[in-house]
Amino acid sequence: MHSTAWAEEVKEEKGIILIDPGHGGIDGGSKSKNGTVEKDINLSIALKLKKALDNEGYNTFLTREADTELSKSKVKDLTMRCDMKKETKCDIFISIHQNKFPKESCFGAQVWYADNDNSLNFAKILQESLRKNVDNKNKRLEKPAKKQYKILRDGYDGASVILECGFLSNTNEEQKLKSDDYQEKIVYAIVQGINEYMKK
């Protein structure tokens, strides 16, 4: 009994992470010309990330664990995801997404961050970890969300970011994003980034 309680206490001390697999259910998110749907990749990466962070000793939560929306209303769905930050008292909120752009040559993961120092600091660390561990040709920089991304504009004090893992509009990157090996590389980069941020 005591050992279990102690383990949970230690787990909480390591940090609380809320993982948000973007979209879900009736909301598929972006779709590639080959028919790849964003929501499925988001969930696949998020589930792998939860497992990896659990193994690291973090206390982790998911906003969704299956192909479901939190509400049929888009506004309510996003509000419910934001509310989970306060409910879990998370140190880090990371929303997993995939990008899409008319220009097919665009590639590379990019981090968007909420308007606070915790988010900026984590975004810088995470963007560098993605460059180092996933693709050193990726010259993208972390960007402030400003008026974009409602999920980052709720005023939460913890580190809140959206990670666009890559571009479904780039055929080569799309194929990578669908593969378990590449998803594991992304997960590894995120875990390294979280570990570095949580040390500070």
Predicted regions and their residues:
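Short glycine-rich His-centered loop
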Residues: 15-35
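Boundary/activation segment at the start of structured domains
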Residues: 1-17, 21
